[in-house]
Amino acid sequence: MIGVLGGTFDPIHFGHLRPALEVFQSIGLTELRFVPLNVAVHRRQPRATGAQRAEMVRVAVQGQTGFRVDENELARPGGSYSYDTLASLREGLGAREPVCLLLGSDAFRHFLTWHRPDAILSLAHLVVMRRP
């Protein structure tokens, strides 16, 4: 099962990493992809460039087996939507590989305002995390 955690990661911090590690270990993910977004649609734009944020994530997760940076979102023009990210991932993986979208409880409170929330649920399971 593959986990996906998107965010600005400007910067990545303990509130991202600790819950992600707990989910990774507790539900037995084989891989956890950290996806830095390109253009924020639900918050202010990041100050660091996409390349800088991807590098911050890469440094933060190095040495943790199964954690990796997915930079596909950074190459996509326009607003960064979880639906588009998951649809692209699902296309590459096929229908059989289970996918989980990890999100903080703060983000989950607004999930129904996201772009195509119903379609997101057809592409991935939701795992809601409480940040430390």
Regions found by a protein language model. Give the residues of each.
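Nucleotidyltransferase catalytic core that binds NTPs
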Residues: 1-132
